[in-house]
Swiss-Prot record:
Any one GO molecular function term: FAD binding
EC main group: oxidoreductase
Any single Gene Ontology cellular-component annotation: cytosol
Keyword Cell division: yes
Compartment annotation: Cytoplasm
Any Gene Ontology biological process: cell wall organization
Organism from which the protein derives: Rhodopseudomonas palustris (strain BisB5)
PROSITE patterns documented for this protein: FAD_PCMH
Active site: R179, S228 (proton donor), E298
Record keywords, A-Z: Cell cycle, Cell division, Cell shape, Cell wall biogenesis/degradation, Cytoplasm, FAD, Flavoprotein, NADP, Oxidoreductase, Peptidoglycan synthesis
The name this protein goes by in its record: UDP-N-acetylenolpyruvoylglucosamine reductase
Domain spans labelled FAD-binding PCMH-type: 35-199
Length: 310
């Protein structure tokens, strides 16, 4: 599927644009599942000023969405109308430590945040070492692991609104809850500051090694996957409910529930986005029938659905 090319009109309205603006750009290569259709327009800003300029000139009727490295994302097969904004490491991937504060651009990998803190002998951010994704995604969904979440370390975050205005949100402004931020969904986060705690380098490294070892042992890290598919219900584990419902190894088309960890869906070879989403909905139905519990998606699903699963 392809969309009418809107990039000539956008470029004409933005003569000072420095970033890259492409029409009908495939999104599948930008996601861990490697599925999905194109973006009607894909914009990669050069830096914060370029992003603010683009947003200030973007017509309000044009849909807009920001993505990261696509580690927690299903792009549907029909693609996304409007503009998809993707922050690149070159302009938004810096990390550094200053005293007990760790600064990170929104395109920095979560793992890099943990490494930067460790190099500065700061603990409290080791949990990021095992989270696949970027700081921007961590802010949007209050990413966490091993008993800690983004809300436990965040000082503040910088973002741009739909009109191109720069804003700074404190921890309370983020309205964090389990795997969710109540901040305006139209905001595009560009950086964040985290507070670390001075700690022994050996102790920090030991925690990071433990996080990595657990992930390697328990999760299908070498598959085309998207991380944890469903949120854990209160006082329960999604994977246990999925296993009890007999869904381990279940397949739809080229999509499969992981044998290693059944809260992970994997693209075994040639899955479509429809295969993966249909498999997820089948799992939800079976869990509801078996336990009465309705699982909630943790993976974000975006775009236009066009093909039924095979």
């Amino acid at each position: 599927m392809s969309f009418p090319d809107i990039t000539p009109d956008l470029k004409a309205a933005m003569p000072s644009l420095r970033g890259r603006l492409l029409g009908n750009e495939p999104l599948a290569p930008l996601t861990w599942f490697r599925v999905g259709g194109p973006a009607q327009a894909l914009f990669t800003p050069a830096d914060e000023d370029d992003l603010g300029y683009f947003l200030s000139r973007l017509p309000t009727e044009v849909p807009m969405l920001c993505i990261g490295v696509g580690s927690n994302l299903i792009v549907r097969d029909g693609g996304l109308p409007g503009v998809v904004i993707r922050l690149a490491p070159r302009g938004f991937g810096d990390t550094r430590a200053d005293g007990e504060i760790v600064y990170a651009g929104a395109a920095a990998l979560d793992k890099r945040v943990a490494e930067t803190a460790a190099a500065a002998k700061l603990g409290g951010l080791e949990f990021y070492f095992g989270i696949p994704g970027t700081v921007g995604g961590a802010l949007r969904m209050n990413a966490g692991a091993n008993g800690r979440e983004t809300k436990d370390a965040l000082i503040d975050a910088t973002a741009f609104d739909r009109s191109g205005n720069r804003r700074v949100l404190g921890n309370a402004d983020m309205q964090f809850s389990y795997r969710h931020s109540g901040a305006d969904p139209a905001l595009i986060f560009t950086s964040a500051r985290f507070r670390g705690t001075p700690a022994s380098p050996d102790a920090i490294r030991a925690k990071m090694n433990e996080v990595q070892a657990h992930r390697e042992l328990a999760q299908p890290v070498r598959e085309k996957t998207g991380g944890s598919t469903f949120k854990n219900p209160p006082d329960n584990s999604a994977w246990k409910l999925i296993d009890a419902a007999g869904c381990r190894g279940l397949r739809v088309g080229g999509a499969q529930v992981s044998e290693m960890h059944c809260n992970f869906l994997i693209n075994t070879s040639d899955a479509t986005a429809a295969d993966i989403e249909t498999l997820g909905e089948t799992v939800r139905e079976r869990v509801k029938a078996q336990s009465g519990i309705e699982l909630q998606w943790e993976i974000k699903r975006i775009g236009v659905a066009v093909d039924a699963a095979r």
